């Protein structure tokens, strides 16, 4: 009884202690909000003219600055800029359905326009017909078009209700504003699409243009009559990086001067996040500052490019482009347990600086390349082809022919936007409305992919292809295991044979027949014999089930039947034309590089890889240089990075784009060379704190300064873990449990994304991601106030700082350096000291007001809680998640 009383007292003390600590944490959170409010007014917080640069601090702070935000109401501006992703959604998911199911009765070409409704134009849909407007943007439930598709009111199309998948596409389209790029009016049909040769002069389809005599070009730009001389801006001294020739010559033409270079600590943080996705450690900072000033920056670049964390950072960018995920999504959201092998292949390839042409070739046709002697390398070539398999698939689609062509359509969409920078999938149902791609072009490439096996079977719920990755070590394991199975089988057989003598000895059978077999089968067994036989059987079955399996990877292989595809009328696989299109690529693109002939017994993937990676190809190098530039500057040279077509934007610096692409190819397609060339330019190293030309060039199109950029979700989470010394930076296969690994290793479930993904603008992983948007929403501030990741990081780092020093000034300095990557100013130190004292006093006051708990109060606990609240406030500042 006495023992039970002691245990009860200990339990009550523990509850009081936990309650006290919880109270401290809650008060610390409230104080952190107050701290963030104070710090926000001081810590490098600037509101620019862009909505995307709002302060990400607690909601109360957002309220203080609300009056400073620009008017962002809809309808302002001289030209409507449609979201590219929504335009592509309309072109690939909405327009084809309208063409196939509605145009016959509701277009300008209809003999009789039924119900006075035209759906072949944007204005026709909005205007509607006899029953009124067909669409109410953002209100699907009020839109007659959706009601008709649902068969609630009128029933359209009359030949049969469309699938739930298509109807859901229309619901989504209307809910997101019914974006429609068509410009024709209801009484003026769109101009028929032109012949491909009419667009032959488009800049993106021309060969790369090498420049001769760069210094002369620079001089010509200086003396160009188009140069703006009104401000008498002198051209800066001859640059050492070729990139700066082009940028500074353009600035001179515009009458603009470049911004100054950013200071050393800003460059350290910028470069560390750009190349590794992680903040610099205190040790890295000290080494950087101790390097010779004239070599400091270049040495830092080399160290970061050599870090294995470089591969983890830049693989995430590529995975966005190729719609990487760990589950199928769509109708059957099955886990893709081996998708991670492709992800790890990308990380390893980037860390090894695999040439980009080889990087692309292996993904397109790695299984068809000459197999290397090294078995690991052979398996990597197979794994690389997972690129084709990663997309979402309608696994339960019972029309397997439709399922297959839809898979091919998704593959074409991802391939064309990622590798070619064009929207070829828009030509499935009709000739491309804007670009020189015909339906024949589409089905020429579709034939290559239809001749490639992506699906393992055509079952009720189909399965994607997975291929074995055999190794000699695993072969030996399997051989040894098979030997054990054979031995167990033989032992069991002998055990059964030995029962003959046992039965005779027991007198159960008076004699054996001449054949010595049949009576033994029918004779009785002793319990001991039964037990031995059962154990031997269990052992054998266990061995058989435990046969070591070969690793498997999502991958493709050549299909048994190679096919040339017929053009499908309006994209409908049930309406093939009589003419078959030879396997190949768009004809407009073979002007610069001829496409190799495809033998009848080959799919054409090998020829596709050879053609695409030819140094003379006009698109691949341009597209990738533009993307790398975008990920370093926050904006690309071509502002539509996945659409180099006629509706895409022209490059701001066309000579720079071509020159950099040509030199990259000459350097062996080395991505690390390309990174080094970009980040060592003056253009990259400029400060973002310059507002001289905000009015004349608000988007910084002419690169007169560096752009301020917000971190994506992954480096935000990784920084919280790294700052609190909790990050598990190991690369490689999945580990048991999620743990504090880098965010690239988080599970991406297409049907159930973690809330953390959506808070910071991670977009739909079911399709190619051109560029992540940057939005400002209240949930981001709430994330920093309430999310356990932030509170745990704050408490952990606060405890670490409290233990490392008893001097508050040293603790404040350490917190600033760990969280923000810089030393605090003297005024920031004074304000922070005041906050810490305020926090300690408040905690002590709360402790006195709390009924006695019987637990001795540790004053150091107040200081630790105050430092945790202080760190929480630093995490909540804008400076933490923005790269200057």
Kindly label every feature range from the protein language model.
Residues 66, 70-77:
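Boundary at the C-terminal end of the N-terminal hydrophobic targeting segment
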Residues 75-171, 180-218, 239-244, 248-249, ...:
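Solvent-exposed helix-loop boundary motif
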Residues 75-77, 168, 179, 203, ...:
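Active-site histidine-acidic residue metal-binding/catalytic motifs
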Residues 27-51:
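Long, intrinsically disordered low-complexity tandem-repeat segments
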Residues 870:
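Globin-like tetrapyrrole-binding proteins
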Residues 54-68:
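Bacterial N-terminal signal peptides
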